[in-house]
Amino acid sequence: MKVIPFKIPQTGKDAIHVQIDKAPHFYNHLHQHQEIQLTLIIKSEGTIIAGDHVGRFTEGDVYIIGSNQPHVFRNDASYFRQKKQAESITVFFDENTLGKPFWQSPEIKSFQYFFRNSNGGFKITGRKKEALKTKLVQMADADGFDKLLLFVEIIKLLSNKKDLKPLSKITIQRSIKTFDGNRLNNILEFIFKESHRTIKLNEIASVANLTPEAFCKYFKTRTRKTYIHFLNEIRINNACQLLMNEDIPVTTVCYRVGFNNLSNFNKVFKKITGKTPKEYKQIG
């Protein structure tokens, strides 16, 4: 499994690239591309990794992925076992879309804030999210001048920072060739598949062909997180999915996602989500 430096396919006839994905699951390899990515999740849920951000995505979410930001929308395990459908609408753009003079024009000077601050990505919230959802759905069926007008309306919505929640603290993106992606992706794939059980340090280190000490240093350098912190984030994301979708006790959730101590599970859950498992379950 390799990290892939993506080249977004161009149709040759459209200046603005809109992609509609409908598949059993989303593309599940960590990857990056030059274009900024604006994505609406129509149907699907799972874990998003974007830079140093690990979180849960679900139906109706809207995200900005920064230029060359390593990312993956990893669906829950059930999407790989059952006949499910993942759907999304994505617009790809950069400073070459519509030509550089367009972005340098005084009329859209306010949008430069977005270009200057988008490398870490955003989760869109509030009224802006609802407005963008409408525009993206319309854009999926539009062409010609209508598509251009909708794109300009989207740019206008993104031109101020209100309702833009930063994702990653990493804002200077490295080339995929220096990201050591093949090794890192093997590590992530192993964690996704085996996080439900105890994973000893020497076991995960062997996946990377490193000593335990070298692995800890490598992982912290690449992700800006300790291995244990990242593993806990994946487990808590899985716990959130179970609490939201299944009527099972918190204790069962604790052991099913890989924790072996209920007290520690409750402590880690609240630290990551800001709520106790019971509070989270009641909200859901």
What are these regions (language model features)?
Residues V268-I272, Y280-G284:
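C-terminal structured domain segments across diverse proteins
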Residues K2-Q10, Q69-T134:
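A hydrophobic/aromatic-rich effector-binding and dimerization subdomain
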Residues F122-K128, A140-R197, E203, V207-A208, ...:
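Short, Lys/Arg-enriched, Trp-marked, Pro/Gly-tolerant hinge/linker segments that flank
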Residues I42, Q112, K133-A140, L188, ...:
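Regular secondary-structure segments
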Residues M1-Y63, Q69-V72, D76, N264:
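Generic protein-terminus/edge-of-domain signal
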Residues E189, K193, T198-T211, K217-S263, ...:
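Terminal helix-turn-helix DNA-binding modules in bacterial transcription factors
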